[in-house]
Amino acid sequence: MTNAIDELQAIIAELKTEVEEQRAVIRQSRDRIEHMSAEVRMNIVKNYERIRDKTVAIVGVGGVGSVTADMLTRCGIGKLILFDYDKVELANMNRLFFTPDQAGLSKVEAAARTLTFINPDVRIETHNYNITTIDNFDNFLNTITGDGTVAGEPVDLVLSCVDNFEARMAINAACNEKCLNWFESGVSENAVSGHIQFLRPGDTACFACAPPLVVAENIDEKTLKREGVCAASLPTTMGITAGFLVQNALKYLLNFGEVSDYLGYNALNDFFPKMTLKPNPQCDDRNCLLRQKEFQARPKPVVVQEEAPTDEPLHASNDWGIELVAEDAPSNAPTDLSQSTDVGQGLRLAYEAPEKSSAEATQAATAPVDDTSLEDLMAQMKSM
């Protein structure tokens, strides 16, 4: 028995050594490979390596949150902070992230293991608790304001991937208090629609500015759940929503493109509504009202007038003699290209419109006008 244990320990030690060697190779290859090289070469994203200096907090590691964490890890994010208090169940296997062997583990622990395997350079910090309780809310608040890439600095972005309004209100209260930008996301109960929303305290509406009826009426969500009925879950809708969320998060973190304030998705007719929600001056969140005053007091950005483009040609050389003309400009192209000296020999039109003869033109111009009515013509035809 002792020999068998020793052999297993030796095998485990050998596997650990092999894994460490593979991780070292991954680190070396990652330094040589530039993330999103196509976007960098095409001048879409400048200095993409800044992604390694960013910290993102993800609240909720379920259907949307787990895929979001996976995408950010593959993009090379510097640090991820995960919040969730639930465990992996076999019912979660229709998601895109968890596997059956992880059943029973906390979602943050299972996610950390998988994400570390995908990209060992990403720092993963996990918190297995419910942020809506008083003590845990204080811990959550301290974490997002002091556990950034630099110790004592806030995170760069908070992503809400929770499935209940109570947690959304807690995130909203924390971000309003600390003036942190955050994204809210969600999938409908029937799993055929989803949305993302970018919330900037004071600039756009917070989650309490136009709350759902459940929140406005202080209704306990637990009383609304029907026994034996759970929310539908489609990995397609969750994957699409997570893709929108990460895409806009990257645009915000790396400062490229246009970040959507609100982007919806309806799978039944592929409808993508976009809008911007203004803050409510009578919001119930006092920190939201404070942020609105601060935003209004900020100096307005100076709009720089762009110089009108000149009419000079973009390229000095024009070896092929290509010219642009207005659509309504008369065409001077000859009907018979063989007689033209401006084009290569052997070219001809695929279709040459026949020219009207002088006789046809004269007949059309001198055609008699007949004032006979339709009734008279019908009477003449009947008498024939």
UniProtKB/Swiss-Prot annotation:
Where along the chain is Zn(2+) bound? C206, C209, C283, C288
Keyword annotations from UniProtKB, A to Z: ATP-binding, Metal-binding, Nucleotide-binding, Ubl conjugation pathway, Zinc
> Which residues of the sequence carry a binding annotation for ATP?
G63, D84, K107, N130, N164
Q: Which GO terms describe its molecular function?
A: ATP binding; metal ion binding; UFM1 activating enzyme activity
Q: What Pfam family does this protein match (any one)?
A: ThiF
GO CC annotation: what is one?
cytosol
Q: Which domain of life is it from?
A: Eukaryota
The record's region (Disordered) falls at 352-375
What InterPro entries has UniProt attached to this entry? D-isomer_DH_CS1 (IPR029752), ThiF/MoeB/HesA (IPR045886), ThiF_NAD_FAD-bd (IPR000594), Ubiquitin-activating_enz (IPR035985)
Q: Where is the active site?
A: C230 (glycyl thioester intermediate)
Read off the CDD domains from this record.
ThiF_MoeB_HesA_family
Which SUPFAM superfamilies does the record associate with it? Answer: Activating enzymes of the ubiquitin-like proteins
GO BP annotations of the record are: protein ufmylation
Q: What does this protein do?
A: E1-like enzyme which activates UFM1.
State the similarity comment: Belongs to the ubiquitin-activating E1 family. UBA5 subfamily.
Protein's name according to its UniProt entry: Ubiquitin-like modifier-activating enzyme 5
Q: What is the lineage of its organism?
A: Eukaryota, Metazoa, Ecdysozoa, Arthropoda, Hexapoda
